[in-house]
Structures are given as structure tokens and as C-alpha cells.
């Protein structure tokens, strides 16, 4: 998926990795980008993420992103940490901070990867102004069994689906 996306990227200064987990994306992104900004709220994987990107140009933000600023609980999957996810029923009452990307001072970025186990649409809703400002290549995971479609949301703002690799869709402008 990365290689498919790289063909469309024109700005290799900064990449955003939303749902960084243990660094499966953040680490290889540093081979192409000067700086990677990672977002990962799961305390159970943060130490591994920090070790995997040690001495690399990666900034780790230890909070979740979403549609509104709030708090939420996370459901941890110890068998496959990549399946850990936001507990949608706990917005406003959880112990993990949620911020909107649109409220943050992020530098111009050429690529944004969002893989947050069915929480992609709320993240996009809270990031759309920043995305429209920078018009990066967007990689977003989409599940066929979800009620929403992150891709349709992006298309409603003028994004074009460039290609997909299994459940990962690549959009551009």
C-alpha cells in the first residue's frame, strides 16, 4: 500500500500516521519522509512504538483523534493489538483524550494514513479542514461491514479514489 501511495505523493517533508500502533507504518515512512507525526492512544503499545522508532524522526502524540474534543475508553485486543479500538459508547466519559486534528497546529503534510478500526470517519470529520488546506494523499482503511464509508465522505469534498489494496483506499485531489 505504501508503495502504491508513494507514486502520488509530491511533498515528502511530513507524513501523519493516525493509528500508529507499534510503528508498522511510522518506521518505514521515515525512509521517504523527513518527519513523521504519529498518533497512538493505546498505552499498552506505546512502549513498543517508542522503541521501534527510537532515533528516527518520529513525533509520537499519545492521544486519539476524532470528530470532537472529548474523552473515550479504548478496547484493547491483546492477541492482535492492531484490532484495538475506540469504545464509541464511552464518548465524554473515558480516560483517553480525544482531539480534533483541525484544532492542532500541524505542519503541511504530503501523506496521511488513517487505520483506526472503524473510527476512520470521525477522524476525517475532525480533520477535513486541515486535509483540504494541505490536500495530501490520504490512505484510509475501510471495512465492508460498517455503516459508514470514509471514502464517500472524502469524495464529497472533492477527493478522487486513486486505487486500493484490499481494505486500504488511496485518495488524492
Predicted regions and their residues:
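Phosphate/nucleotide-binding beta-alpha loop and adjacent structural elements of enzyme active sites
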Residues: 1-173
Amino acid at each position: 500500500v505504501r508503495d502504491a501511495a508513494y507514486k502520488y505523493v509530491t511533498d515528502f517533508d511530513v507524513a501523519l500516521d493516525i493509528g500508529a500502533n507499534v510503528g508498522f507504518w511510522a518506521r518505514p515512512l521515515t525512509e521517504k519522509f523527513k518527519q513523521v507525526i504519529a498518533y497512538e492512544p493505546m498505552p499498552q503499545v506505546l512502549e513498543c512504538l517508542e522503541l521501534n522508532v527510537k532515533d528516527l524522526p518520529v513525533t509520537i502524540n499519545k492521544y486519539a483523534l476524532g470528530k470532537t474534543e472529548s474523552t473515550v475508553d479504548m478496547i484493547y485486543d491483546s492477541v492482535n493489538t492492531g484490532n484495538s479500538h475506540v469504545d464509541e459508547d464511552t464518548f465524554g466519559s473515558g480516560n483517553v483524550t480525544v482531539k480534533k486534528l483541525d484544532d492542532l497546529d500541524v505542519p503541511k503534510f504530503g501523506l496521511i494514513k488513517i487505520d483506526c478500526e472503524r473510527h476512520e470517519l470521525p477522524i476525517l470529520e475532525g480533520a477535513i479542514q486541515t486535509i483540504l488546506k494541505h490536500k495530501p494523499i490520504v490512505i484510509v482503511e475501510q471495512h465492508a461491514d460498517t455503516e459508514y464509508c470514509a471514502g464517500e465522505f472524502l469524495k464529497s469534498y472533492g477527493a478522487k479514489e486513486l486505487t486500493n489494496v484490499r481494505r486500504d483506499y488511496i485518495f488524492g485531489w
